[in-house]
UniProtKB/Swiss-Prot annotation:
Source organism superkingdom: Eukaryota
Domain writeup: The cysteine framework is III (CC-C-C-CC).
GO MF term set: toxin activity
Keyword match Disulfide bond: yes
Protein name: Conotoxin QcIIIB
Protein family membership: Belongs to the conotoxin M superfamily.
Primary location recorded for the protein, binned into one broad class: secreted
Entry keywords, A to Z: Disulfide bond, Hydroxylation, Secreted, Toxin
Native species: Conus quercinus
Modified residues (4-hydroxyproline): 11
Cystine crosslinks: 1-13, 2-9, 6-12
Subcellular localization: Secreted
Tissue: Expressed by the venom duct.
GO cellular component, as recorded: extracellular region
Length: 15
């Protein structure tokens, strides 16, 4: 994703 804690594309960040 776009955050450092988001290593997969899940709805936790805007992108």
């Amino acid at each position: 994703c776009c955050s450092r804690h988001c290593w997969v594309c899940i709805p936790c960040c805007p992108n």
